[in-house]
Curated annotation (Swiss-Prot):
Keywords: Ribonucleoprotein, Ribosomal protein. GO terms for cellular component: cytoplasm; small ribosomal subunit. This is Small ribosomal subunit protein bS16. One of its GO terms (biological process) is translation. Pfam families: Ribosomal_S16. One of its GO terms (molecular function) is structural constituent of ribosome. Belongs to the bacterial ribosomal protein bS16 family.
Length: 180
């Protein structure tokens, strides 16, 4: 029986969520599987991968062939590197301690890169938020300035109209006095 390590789709329409499973190559995409190895959530940025490294390496040792996307996920989490290093230990090129040390340094470097990306994304998001807030305050100041100018212009027009009325009434009264 040939075994594949592949993704099994779960989640809603438009919101995929995958299980990383070891399944018989002849079974359906979302059908029966032998073992659930982990999960993959592409909806987050960066994508969230939860993988049982030992189970994945066990299936790789047993000859399971990962699909392209599953291979990328296994590589991202270090399962392929561990499988490669275990091959070196079996051949006698490395000791188990050396292989574990190489894997640990690689995992630390990889987690540093992922953390840097997360920090960069949060920084970019906060910068965009601050820029939008600044643009909004500038727009509010302009709007308030135009409203005050319009209010002053309206006051001037009303004041001018009242002075004209006073002048008209004064001239009318003067005309009435002359006639009388």
């Amino acid at each position: 029986m040939s075994v594949k390590i592949r993704l099994q789709r779960h989640g809603k329409k438009g919101k995929p969520f995958y299980w990383v499973v070891a399944a018989d190559a002849r079974s359906k995409r979302d059908g029966k599987y032998l073992e659930k190895i982990g999960t993959y959530n592409p909806n987050t940025n960066p994508a969230t991968v939860d993988l049982n490294l030992d189970a994945a390496v066990k299936w790789l040792h047993n000859g399971a062939q990962p699909t392209d996307t599953a291979r990328a996920i296994l590589s991202y989490k270090g399962a392929l590197l561990k499988h490669h290093l275990d091959g070196g230990v079996r051949k006698g090129a490395l000791t188990q301690d050396q292989a574990d040390a190489k894997l640990a340094t690689w995992i630390e470097a990889k987690s540093g890169k992922v953390d840097a990306k997360k920090e960069g994304l949060t920084k970019a998001q906060s910068d965009a938020k601050a820029k939008a807030f600044k643009a909004e305050t500038v727009a509010n100041e302009k709007r308030i300035a135009t409203q005050t100018e319009a209010a002053k212009a309206l006051e001037a027009v009303v004041e001018e109209a009242t002075t004209e009325e006073v002048v008209e009434t004064a001239t009318e009264e003067a005309n009435e006095e002359k006639e009388a």
